[in-house]
Regions:
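Beta1-alpha1 glycine-rich phosphate/pyrophosphate-binding loop at the start
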Residues: 2-89, 93, 177-178, 184-201
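FAD-binding core/adjacent interface of flavoenzyme oxidoreductases
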Residues: 2-16, 86-178, 196
Length: 201
């Protein structure tokens, strides 16, 4: 990438180190939060970049999917809690570490470049679909609030439809949930959804 292709945003104070945090999830949020706690005002310029303006507390997502807690209780607004951090709601689409410049792509407008002295990459993860036919097209992941709410909405819709049907294959299909993965999230969401189903049936 040619560093001259985009405009460059440099620090307003070139005498302080510029710390760029890529990703506003758990690791990124707490990195910026701890830097605010340990650095004096003006000692460094911290910028955090994430497509979302909030951190998602992922251990609560199974509870959100089952409706045990509201979605707003599983998120932390970045700007509300990071008072001395520059919060950019955008994506980091390129890193030129040799020149210490990151390409930032906002949801509206042209990409620009952000200079840094230190970079912390905590971009997070996405749900894996595995080489299983039908997973990519039909399954819903469980990494974001939006996915947890989508699971809850799908379940409630299926229960409403099943309530109008007599016993049979279509009713069984609507009331069947498959959890792919037996890790922490898989076991938690299985237990939460079973409790939800028991309460509704």
């Amino acid at each position: 990438m040619n560093v001259k292709e985009f405009s460059t945003v440099s620090s307003t104070n070139d005498t302080v180190p510029r710390i760029l945090v890529v990703g506003g999830g758990y690791a990124g949020f707490y990195t910026a939060w701890k830097l605010e706690k340990h650095l004096r005002r003006g000692e460094a310029e911290v910028t955090i970049v994430d497509p979302l303006p909030y951190m998602t507390y992922q251990p609560f997502l199974p509870e959100v999917a089952a409706g045990s807690i509201e979605a707003r209780h599983a998120v932390v607004a970045l700007r509300r809690h990071l008072k001395r951090t520059n919060v950019l709601t955008a994506k980091v689409t390129g890193i030129d570490h040799a020149n210490k410049v990151a390409t930032i792509t906002p949801p509206v407008g042209e990409p620009f470049q952000q200079e840094y002295d230190q970079i912390v990459v905590t971009a997070g993860s996405v749900s894996r679909t595995f080489p299983i036919p039908g997973i990519a097209d039909n399954a819903i992941g469980l990494k974001t609030i939006e996915e947890a709410v989508a699971i809850r909405d799908r379940l409630m819709s299926n229960f409403d439809k099943a309530a109008l049907l007599p016993p049979g294959p279509e009713r069984d299909r609507l009331l069947t949930v498959v959890v792919v993965g037996g890790g922490f999230a898989g076991i938690e969401v299985f237990a939460e959804l079973r409790s939800l189903a028991s309460a509704l049936l």
